[in-house]
Curated annotation (Swiss-Prot):
Belongs to the bacterial ribosomal protein bL28 family. Transmembrane segments: none annotated. This is Large ribosomal subunit protein bL28. InterPro entries: Ribosomal_bL28, Ribosomal_bL28/bL31-like_sf, Ribosomal_bL28_bact-type, Ribosomal_bL28_sf. GO terms for molecular function: structural constituent of ribosome. GO terms for biological process: translation. It comes from Anaplasma phagocytophilum (strain HZ). Pfam families: Ribosomal_L28. The keyword Ribonucleoprotein applies. The lineage of its organism: Bacteria, Pseudomonadati, Pseudomonadota, Alphaproteobacteria, Rickettsiales.
Length: 103
């Protein structure tokens, strides 16, 4: 069970712990992950994903999962997120979306 965000791919990073005397020791920073259920309004589906808190705040700020994925570059998304994004684009293009008038 890896500690990686399913949407952005954010994972453990490394740095230094610096003491008062300025000694530096290696340390790692873990991602604050949460198991959440995100709803796609266009597809009318729920997706159970492991998401970083930072990503979750960004999704809320952008207006939901659909708008976040459509307005984010595919290079910044994981393969799981790219598949969801493709399904959303196809649903909008074919007119089979649950709420096509909102986007």
């Amino acid at each position: 069970m890896s500690r990686v965000c399913d949407i952005t791919g954010a994972s453990k990073s490394f740095g230094n712990k610096v003491s008062h005397s300025n000694r530096k020791t290696k340390r790692s920073y873990l991602v604050n992950l949460h198991n959440v259920t995100l709803v796609s309004e266009v597809l009318g589906r729920k997706f159970r994903v492991k998401v970083a808190s930072r990503t979750l705040r960004t999704i809320d700020y952008k207006g939901g999962l659909d708008l976040y994925l459509l307005n984010t570059s595919s290079r910044k998304l994981t393969e799981v997120a790219r598949k969801i994004k493709r399904k959303i684009k196809v649903a909008i293009a074919t007119g089979k979306s649950k709420q096509s008038d909102n986007i």
